[in-house]
Design a protein with these regions (language model features):
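A short, exposed helix-loop element centered on a Lys and neighboring polar residues
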Residues: 88-89
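Helix N-cap/beta-alpha junction loops of NAD(P)-dependent oxidoreductase domains
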Residues: 71-74, 118
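Conserved glycine-rich Rossmann-like NAD(P)H-binding loop of the short-chain dehydrogenase/reductase
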Residues: 23-37
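Residue(s) in the substrate-gating loop at a strand-loop-helix junction
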Residues: 114
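Rossmann-fold scaffold of SDR-type NAD(P)-dependent oxidoreductases
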Residues: 6, 61-68, 108-111
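Conserved Rossmann-fold cofactor-binding substructure of NAD(P)-dependent oxidoreductases
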Residues: 43-61
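N-terminal Rossmann NAD(P)H-binding glycine-rich loop of SDR-like oxidoreductase domains
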Residues: 6-23
Length: 118
């Protein structure tokens, strides 16, 4: 299964990356920061979830895990809410308006939140 994880360089995101790799999945990580993860089934991309025009088009994930977020920032709504919406709209759905439907490959979308990112 191909899993897309946003916030892949942070604590929860990095743990998710490792867990999915340990379970044999192909993982794509989005983050503004680099990662120390080196694995044949891992692809790390420096991506800002607030900027959907920067998203690569060739991913077709079956699972999306939205972990990316910032704390105590003027951008918290843009990153924590809009970023999650941007990624989910781009990879979990096809079509526009009333014709929107789930992407054929998508099986699950997981949105992670914490008290610090409220």
């Amino acid at each position: 299964m191909r899993v897309l994880i946003t916030g892949a360089s942070g604590g929860i995101g990095a743990a998710c990356v490792q867990r999915f790799l340990d379970e044999g999945h192909e993982v794509v990580g989005f983050d503004l920061l680099p990662t120390a993860v080196e694995h044949e089934r891992y692809r790390h991309l420096i991506v800002d979830v607030r900027e959907p025009n920067s998203f690569p088009g060739d991913l077709e994930p079956q699972v999306i895990v939205n972990v990316a977020g910032v704390q105590d920032s003027a951008d918290d709504i843009a990153a924590n809410l809009r970023g999650t919406i941007n990624v989910t709209e781009r990879y979990a759905f096809v079509g526009e308006g009333l014709a929107t439907k789930p992407a054929p490959a998508i099986q699950s979308v997981v949105n992670v939140g914490s008290a610090s990112g409220h």
